[in-house]
Amino acid sequence: MEKIAILRWESGHVPQGLMQLEQLPGNSTNPASYPFPVKLVEVKGANTDTVILHPSQKLLEDMIQLAKELEKEGVRAITTSCGFNAIFQEALANAVDIPVFTSSLLQVPFAQALVGRDRAVGVITASASSLSEKHLRACGITDEMHPIVMGLENAPEWSKIFDHPDDSFDMDLVTEEILNVARQGVKDHPEIGAIVLECTDLPPFAHRIREELDIPVFDFNSMIGHVAMALSIVKLY
């Protein structure tokens, strides 16, 4: 049986561009991204508005109920398909007795420890304007860490998910936009020693970012892989 459950957005409420990204190897909602089975669970009412733009208390209550049901079914850990669920991290983790890891932002303190106090961690997010102090604090990110947040919401192709959700992505354009945000971030902030990709649709681009910038890049897959090893769902030896 599937040992890790991924709480995902409701079908019919996912922007067309993100549905394209779901087909890529490495995407959080593509089962082929993992060397172990995962259980994808739709959360009714989960969408751009209720997760990113206006985090919903009702949605949180529904997620808690689903988490409890999954725990009873024997699932050993629960994650989510959007890094902005970080704002629900404490409530979800407190609601069940199995590990809950809502967002790749949980890796920022780890990355900061790796690069040392004189360097910074860059965070590439779907929307910098929506990523609040509450999201960061929920993941253990303190004032002393000073992560450098780089948003994609002003990139014309990417912004379709907010402004024109029924429009498809030009995949070449959106790929270049993602890479450019990473390039420009490191150019403007040469102190960046590692990057964390908040958005769970960005892991398919992580290899390109690593190759171009030659720094560690953490994403949803590095997080779920870490937990899978901790639970012996996968083994290195």
Predicted regions and their residues:
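N-terminal glycine-rich anion-binding loop in soluble enzyme alpha/beta folds
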Residues: M1-K58, S127-F169
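Gly/Ser/Thr-rich loops at beta-strand to alpha-helix junctions
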Residues: E10-H13, A77-F88, S104-Q107, A126-S130, ...
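Glycine-rich, highly charged phosphate/nucleotide-binding loops
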Residues: I52-E69, L173-A182
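N-terminal active-site wall of soluble small-molecule enzyme domains
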Residues: Q57-L66, F84-A91, A95
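Non-catalytic positions within long, well-ordered alpha-helices that form the structural scaffold/packing
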Residues: E71-G74, Q112, V186-D188
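Short, acidic/small-residue loops that bind anionic groups at enzyme active sites
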Residues: A91-V115, R210-A228
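Charge-patterned, long linear interaction tracts outside catalytic cores
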Residues: L173-H207
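C-terminal functional extensions of proteins
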Residues: E198, L202, F218-Y237
